Amino acid sequence: VEVRTRVWYNPDMSSEVFMIPGLIGLVLQFQATLLTSSAIVRERERSTIEQLIVTPIRPFELILGKILPYAVVELVVVAEVLLVGTLWFGVAIKGSLALLLAIAGLFLISTLAIGLLISTISKTQYEAFQLSFLTLLPSVFVSGFIYPIAAMPPALQLVSRIIPLTHFLVVVRGIIIKGVG
C-alpha cells in the first residue's frame, strides 16, 4: 500500500494562488477604511460640516456623496489586482467573475461603513488614522490572510469570526481557487 498526499485546488502549492485572493481583500479593506475614515472628520476640522448640514440634502445623500467616490475607486482597485494576479502571476479565476465582483461590493460596503464610523467618532484626522490602523492590524493577522484560522488558539478563532475580512477571504478563495459559483 502506497500512501500519496494529494493537494486539491492548488496542486503546485503555489503561494501566489493563495496570496492573490487574500491580497484583494487586504487592499480593499486597507484603502477603503483609511480613505473613508477621514471623510467626515476632515469636514469637521475645516469647520465646513455645519455648511453641509444646512444644505437641502438629506443625511443619507450626504453620506452617499462622501463614500460613493471611494467605492468607485476601490472597485477599480479590485479590477487592477485581479488583472495583475491573472496576467502577471498566472492566477486563474476558476469561478464566477460576476459573483466575485458582487461579493467584493458587499465587502466594500462593510469596510466603507467601518471607515465612516471611525470618521464620525474621531475628533481629528490623526485620530481617525490611528483608529483605522487599530482595526486593520488585527485583520491582517487574525483573518486567515497569513496564518490559517484552524491553527489559531480558540480565543483568536472567536475574534476572527467578527472580522469581515475573514469571511471575505473564505468566499474569494473559494471563487478563485476552487471554482465556486
Question: What do the predicted segments below correspond to?
Answer:
Residues 26, 30-31, 42, 74, ...:
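Transmembrane alpha-helical core positions of polytopic small-molecule transporters
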Residues 1-100, 121, 127-130, 151, ...:
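Transmembrane helix-boundary elements of multi-pass transport/secretion proteins
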Residues 126-143:
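Pore- or pathway-lining transmembrane helices of multi-pass membrane proteins that form conduits
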Residues 9-12, 92, 143-181:
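Membrane-interfacial helix-loop-helix junctions in multi-pass membrane proteins
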Residues 25, 106, 126, 157-160:
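Alpha-helical transmembrane segments of integral membrane proteins
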Residues 100-122, 140-143:
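Hydrophobic alpha-helical transmembrane segments of polytopic membrane proteins
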